[in-house]
Each structure stands twice: as C-alpha cells, then as structure tokens.
C-alpha cells in the first residue's frame, strides 16, 4: 500500500457541521482532498417539562443509555444548566452505542460501563441484557427524534426493566442546493461520498436534482458508515462501493481505500 493511498482522490463527507473532524483528518493523512456537504443539521430542543422531570429523578435511575454522541451533548448541556457538579448524576451507570458516543461521554470525565460492539441500537440492548440483570431496574434512554422505539421496547419487554425515554435533539434535513459546497460538488464531483446515516441518504435523495455532478465531473461512489446506512443506500438505488467495519475514522478511511482499489 502506498504511503498516501488516497493521493489525488476527492472525498465528500455528509455529516452535520462540526462533526467528523477525525474522519477528515484520517482521510487527509491518507492523501485525500476532503470537502464537506452537511446534508443534516442537529437542533437541541428537548421537551422542557419531560427534561425537568428526568433531572428531578436522576438519583432514581440505575442506567442511562445513550444512543449517540449528540444525545450525550444534548443531555449534559441541559444537565449543567440545572447542576454545577457532575456528581449530581448520582451512582448511575452508563451504556453507549458505539465508540463515538463513548468518546463524547468521556469528555464529561465519565466512563461508559458498557459500549456496544456493533453500531445498532438493538445490539446495545442485547449486550446490556446479556451482561447485566436489569429486571425491575430503572433505565433512562437518551435519544433523538429519528430513533425508533425498538430499543426501549426490548429493554422493557425483554429485560423487564422500567424504561423512560427522553429525546434531547432533532435531526433535520439541511438544504445545501445554494451553498458553495454544493456548487463545488457539481463542478468537480468526487471519487467517494460518505454517508453516516439513513437520514443523510434521504436528504441526498430529496436534493439529488441540485447535487448532480456536471458533465465531465467525477462521478462518486458511495461508502456507508455501517449496515443500516448501507441498507438505506441499496433501497434508494444508490450504488454501494463499501461499508465501514466500524463507525470510526480508521474504519471509514479503510473502507474508502478499499472502495477505490
């Protein structure tokens, strides 16, 4: 393998602004030219009444389950509006979906007691049930507006846990048609476009007419962060060139390299 296996290659990342800096760094280190086309935006808008009830009851929870790094940030941003001391979380244990979520939790000097090896919510629930007896324990699932109820249902019905759910952020489609990034994408195209979620795939489809590379521009192949996003690409009819083995910067870089080999 060349020291710069992505030299002269162009890669587009579609994550929300301010996310995926480590992905970009890993790709640039491999020689790629990287541009960003944020197809989604994150808004932290929890239900204040529900949030107040949850924070009032923090000492009652046995586990807090985070399904994303955005959930961690959204929860603790509001947590510290109420409390000034991290010890106010009490003796709760934490479960995280994936290494990015675990990394976000560590930024608050908290360790994850369980991190799912696979990047899907049901795997997190199954691992938690397999390694810990949570029957009759009180669990708080912190999530976003697009997450399905499968994880809370699994924990409640399969593990007989007492489950509360709070949505602390919303993922919304971002229009990029008139942006400089979109104009550059149309003009130059790319070798690879990386999708990090099914909602990013959906946003791309909705804006496909304004994101079509010009004649003579590079026609990109798609790489998915994981199996769920890969399925969304297939269902959308977008040719899939590769899927990362894990939702990490190194795995994304390797998937891009393999897709272009």
Q: PLM features: what roles do these ranges have?
A:
Residues 1-261:
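Signature of uroporphyrinogen-III synthase
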């Amino acid at each position: 393998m060349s020291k710069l296996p992505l030299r002269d290659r162009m890669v587009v990342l579609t994550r929300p602004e301010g996310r995926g800096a480590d992905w970009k760094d890993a790709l640039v280190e491999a020689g790629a030219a990287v541009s960003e086309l944020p197809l989604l935006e994150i808004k932290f808008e929890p239900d204040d009444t529900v949030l107040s009830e949850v924070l009032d009851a923090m000492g009652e929870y046995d586990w807090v389950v985070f399904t994303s790094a955005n959930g961690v940030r959204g929860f603790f941003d509001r947590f510290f509006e109420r409390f000034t001391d991290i010890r106010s979380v009490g003796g709760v244990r934490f479960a995280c979906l994936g290494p990015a979520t675990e990394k976000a939790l560590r930024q608050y000097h908290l360790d994850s007691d369980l991190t799912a090896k696979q990047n899907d919510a049901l795997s997190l629930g199954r691992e938690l049930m397999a390694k810990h007896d949570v029957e009759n324990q009180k669990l708080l699932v912190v999530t976003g507006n697009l997450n399905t109820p499968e994880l809370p249902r699994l924990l409640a019905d399969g593990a007989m846990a007492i489950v509360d759910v709070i949505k602390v952020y919303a993922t919304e489609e971002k229009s990029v048609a008139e942006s400089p990034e979109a104009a550059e994408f149309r003009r130059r195209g790319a070798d690879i476009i990386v999708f990090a979620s099914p909602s990013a795939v959906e946003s791309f489809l909705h804006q496909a007419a304004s994101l079509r590379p010009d004649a003579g521009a590079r026609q990109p192949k798609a790489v998915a962060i994981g199996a769920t996003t890969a399925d969304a690409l297939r269902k959308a009819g977008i040719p899939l060139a590769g899927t990362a083995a894990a939702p990490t910067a190194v795995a994304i870089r390797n998937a891009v390299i393999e897709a272009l080999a």
